[in-house]
C-alpha cells in the first residue's frame, strides 16, 4: 500500500520538477559597443555570443554569454588594450541574464530588466526596450543597452591625456529560435 502511494506521489510530482516547458536557442547574434573620444570614436563587434532560454510555468530565463576578447574594432592594438582595461584576462566573459514572461514573444516591443556581469562587476539595467520581429519560428530582437564604463568600475582609457566618454552603448541584434 505504501509503495502504491509513493509511486502515485512520484508520478504526480515529478513532472513539476522535470524539464522546461520550452527552450530557446540563440541562433545568431551581433553585439556592438561604441566608445567616443573628442578626437575619434570606435566600435567593437562580436558575432560569437551564445545563449539559451528556458521557459517554465509562464516565465523564461535567458542567459547570453560572449568572450571579451571576441570583440573586433578593426585595430588589434585597440582590441588588446580594451581587454586589458576591462580586465578580460581575469574576467574573460560578459554574461547577461534576464527573465521575461513567456507571452513577451507575442509583442512588438519588450522592456527587459537585465543583469550584466562584465569586468568583475555586476550592473542592473531596468526596462531596456527591445524590438521584436517574428518570422516563422525565428524571433529577432534588437535594441541598445545604455551601458557606461562607470557601471562596471572601468577607468576610462585616454588618448593624449583626454579620457574617452563614460557612455558605452551596446547595440544588440539577436535571432532566437525554439528548440
Describe these PLM feature segments.
Residues 1-6:
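Bacterial N-terminal signal peptides that target proteins for export
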Residues 19-179:
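Low-complexity, acidic/polar, glycine-enriched regions of mature
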Residues 11-18:
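Hydrophobic h-region of N-terminal signal peptides that target proteins for export
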Amino acid at each position: 500500500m505504501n509503495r502504491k502511494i509513493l509511486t502515485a506521489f512520484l508520478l504526480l510530482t515529478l513532472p513539476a520538477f522535470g524539464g522546461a516547458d520550452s527552450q530557446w536557442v540563440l541562433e545568431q547574434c551581433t553585439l556592438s559597443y561604441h566608445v567616443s573620444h573628442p578626437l575619434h570614436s570606435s566600435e567593437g563587434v562580436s558575432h560569437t555570443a551564445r545563449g539559451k532560454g528556458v521557459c517554465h510555468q509562464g516565465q523564461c530565463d535567458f542567459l547570453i554569454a560572449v568572450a571579451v576578447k571576441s570583440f573586433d574594432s578593426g585595430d588589434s592594438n585597440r582590441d588588446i588594450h580594451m581587454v586589458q582595461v576591462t580586465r578580460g584576462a581575469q574576467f574573460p566573459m560578459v554574461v547577461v541574464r534576464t527573465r521575461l514572461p513567456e507571452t513577451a514573444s507575442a509583442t512588438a516591443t519588450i522592456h527587459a530588466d537585465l543583469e550584466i556581469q562584465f569586468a568583475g562587476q555586476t550592473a542592473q539595467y531596468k526596462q531596456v526596450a527591445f524590438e521584436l520581429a517574428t518570422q516563422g519560428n525565428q524571433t529577432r530582437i534588437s535594441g541598445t543597452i545604455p551601458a557606461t564604463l562607470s557601471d562596471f568600475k572601468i577607468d576610462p582609457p585616454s588618448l593624449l591625456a583626454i579620457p574617452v566618454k563614460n557612455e558605452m552603448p551596446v547595440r544588440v541584434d539577436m535571432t532566437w529560435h525554439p528548440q
